[in-house]
Amino acid sequence: MQASRSATRHLLRHATRPPSGFVCRSCLSRRSSSTSASPRSPPPPPPTAGFTALKSRRLISVSGPDAAKYLQGVVTANIINNNKTGFYTAFLNAQGRVLHDVFIYPDASKDGEGFLIEVDATEAERLTRHIKRYKLRAKLNLRLLDDGEATVWQAWDDSKADFAPAVGMTTPVRDPRSPMLGYRVLTPGDHAQTPQLDLDPTPETSYRIRRYLQGVAEGQTEILREHALPAESNMDVTGAIDFRKGCYVGQELTIRTRHRGVVRKRILPCVLYDHFAAPERLEYKHDGVVTAEGVPPETSIGRATKRGRSTGKWLSGVGNIGLALCRLEIMTDLTLPGEPAAALESGNDEFVLTPKSDEDVGSEGAPFKVKAFVPDWLRQGLAAQTAGH
């Protein structure tokens, strides 16, 4: 009787297990055909021009006589050189790991003594506490803005190389992380008060897909708090770090990596595919059988034909694309500085999401394969770094 009950529990546990992200959508559909539930369809491809409110971001006001001095000592960019316009940067911990990726904008209402810090909305309260804890005797005022006080927008138009939206009171900031991302725009009020742009509004998922296609990570679900390194997050290429400025928290490891270390891993855009041939180009597909929905964050990536150390780590995705932290000499054609080009072994140039256990793989499908791509802006930036050494 005890054995019968144990067998019944085993069957129930496996029968009710939620579908894994490693199985194709058609398999998931068959698995759930006896119920009304169905896998959520990925969003359609993003438009080539549009704007969207970034509800995933929030703003923190920092003002006072010591605001600039304080921020200069805790972020990776040089705020003295950027105090007239917005810029991209990061807060690090003492070990040189990323705490928060942020944009910082001058606050025109504070007479040159104020800034607005844009951060991952889920991390805004944490960053506010962090600043408050370490401001010591600095003369500054700190406040987390309510959602309805101001809104962060992203605007783009691929048909215009010199596109720069005119929005009245706000100053658009060109997104430095990729030439194709467009501009950041701040407006007072909530997202119902849209900026005056000759563009059509679009959901925030459009911006997310565009980020993934450009290989740009954002927020602490993609740039892992206290784990990610600035260079591995491509911050050394996107202008987030001033390597000539004075001391700041986390500077020692960052500078040492720049001058004496080798960055072996970087966040790259990736395509998921199944048994078909590896894709030749990075392309978003929302109507295929492969979907990143349900793939757990930080899932390991390994060689398809043999076991060994991890070659990467999946971070986030939508549809058939996503971001992963990839070992460059294994998953790409890039050659690391001072090292010979790695020769891929025959049959070992395919990579798969590696489940943590057998239970993570459905019986109807095999693990997804992963192909990493190096975006042009990153390839060019790394070439410029190599030439400058």
Swiss-Prot record:
<protein>
    <recommendedName>
        <fullName>Iron-sulfur cluster assembly factor IBA57 homolog, mitochondrial</fullName>
    </recommendedName>
</protein>
<dbReference type="Pfam" id="PF25455">
    <property type="entry name" value="Beta-barrel_CAF17_C"/>
</dbReference>
<dbReference type="GO" id="GO:0005759">
    <property type="term" value="C:mitochondrial matrix"/>
</dbReference>
<dbReference type="InterPro" id="IPR006222">
    <property type="entry name" value="GCV_T_N"/>
</dbReference>
<dbReference type="InterPro" id="IPR017703">
    <property type="entry name" value="YgfZ/GcvT_CS"/>
</dbReference>
<dbReference type="Pfam" id="PF01571">
    <property type="entry name" value="GCV_T"/>
</dbReference>
<dbReference type="InterPro" id="IPR045179">
    <property type="entry name" value="YgfZ/GcvT"/>
</dbReference>
<feature type="compositionally biased region" description="Basic residues">
    <location>
        <begin position="7"/>
        <end position="16"/>
    </location>
</feature>
<feature type="transit peptide" description="Mitochondrion">
    <location>
        <begin position="1"/>
        <end position="40"/>
    </location>
</feature>
<dbReference type="GO" id="GO:0016740">
    <property type="term" value="F:transferase activity"/>
</dbReference>
<keyword id="KW-0809">Transit peptide</keyword>
<comment type="similarity">
    <text>Belongs to the GcvT family. CAF17/IBA57 subfamily.</text>
</comment>
<dbReference type="InterPro" id="IPR027266">
    <property type="entry name" value="TrmE/GcvT_dom1"/>
</dbReference>
<keyword id="KW-0496">Mitochondrion</keyword>
<feature type="region of interest" description="Disordered">
    <location>
        <begin position="1"/>
        <end position="20"/>
    </location>
</feature>
<dbReference type="GO" id="GO:0016226">
    <property type="term" value="P:iron-sulfur cluster assembly"/>
</dbReference>
